[in-house]
Amino acid sequence: DQGIEHSAGASFAPNPLYFDPANIVELALAGGCNAVASTLGVLGSVSRKYAHKIPFLVKLNHNETLTYPAMYDQTLFASVDQAFDLGAVAVGATIYFGSPEARRQIMEISEAFARAHELGMVTVLWAYLRNPGFKKDGVDYHVSADLTGQGNHLGVTIEADIIKQKMAENNDGYRKIGFGNTNKKVYDELTSDHPIDLVRYQVVTSYMGRAGLINSGGASGQNDFAEAVRTAVINKR
């Protein structure tokens, strides 16, 4: 959904052939991808030709950037039934946990995921945190293991089959910011400063890996420790 989240020009002007949705799907096929995730419009425009060649995942909501002044909210652009009708096997959505809009987003996506499961579709949640208060004393706790872990836990509560989460880079967000509830054992026994342990806690809060976890982001270069050893060896802890 880069064309919505970052604008079509910003996303595709460097490689104009990707203004054509067919080329996005062709790239996924050539790259051996196991699915292609995009918007209702992108996938719907080429579904007759490609839906039987590679699994489609329709992203249901987006944060569009044409609103001025800029705001951060996930708005539903598509329904589960629209995704199903074009031949998609999965739907995805983003919730900005911690934001003022989170409660509404939770209700919307919980309802959408319930419908998707009625139709036998897979559900994927981008369980991202967003609140300016999550930055304190120069530290960005949007990537704290305890807070992202709770985002994961909320996501699996509405039956996300797969959670997409930013890689944890620090910990102790609850206590440093001074809100919510936690337990000393989270920091003394269940985690350490090691990147793999931070990822393990994200897996633990995803029902001990019963829901799959995909990490994105993390520190650049060698600091990502091979993406925290491929998300703690593909969620086997």
Can you say where each PLM-predicted feature lies in the sequence?
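Alpha/beta enzyme core
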Residues: I4-L213, Q222-R237
